[in-house]
Amino acid sequence: MKWSLMAFIIGFLMDLLIGDPHGFPHPVVFIGREITWLERGLRRIFPKSPGGEKAAGGLLWLVVVFTSTGIPLLLLGICHRISPWLRLAVESVMCWQILAVKSLRDESMKVYDALESGDMEQSRHAVSQIVGRDTSTLDDAAITRAAVETVAENTSDGIVAPLLYLAIGGAPLGFCYK
């Protein structure tokens, strides 16, 4: 457990300093691809009925949670057998990838800076990078509201909940949450 606690602290500090570099492979992308691939296959196997979709959804959930938790657990076990220091390094990187402190701050500050400069087009573009809605007609109040809502939601999804899961069960439970 002490290795997971050290990895938790190192991963958190890495996230504060580095954030999510563009182009760096992110495990959540792989989890999303796994979901898409499994969903396609399960739709072919299970009937298109409420019961079939419920069964397919349950199986999908089970497989994704199992692999998202099991792969990190297995990888950390292998690393620990080689060297506890290797495990610390790998789990630190895993913890770093689960968190979104710096990236959330950086992206939301782009909205703030654009609003402060009075550039509505840049403000709309900046907020469009963090929300899932059409921003082309938003005024400054609506842009501010959209940014605040997104920051509040993503603080829960990308910072608070992952920190809780990482603190309880290390990177494997953090990936289980994701």
Go through the PLM ranges and name each one:
Residues 1-175:
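Hydrophobic alpha-helical transmembrane segments
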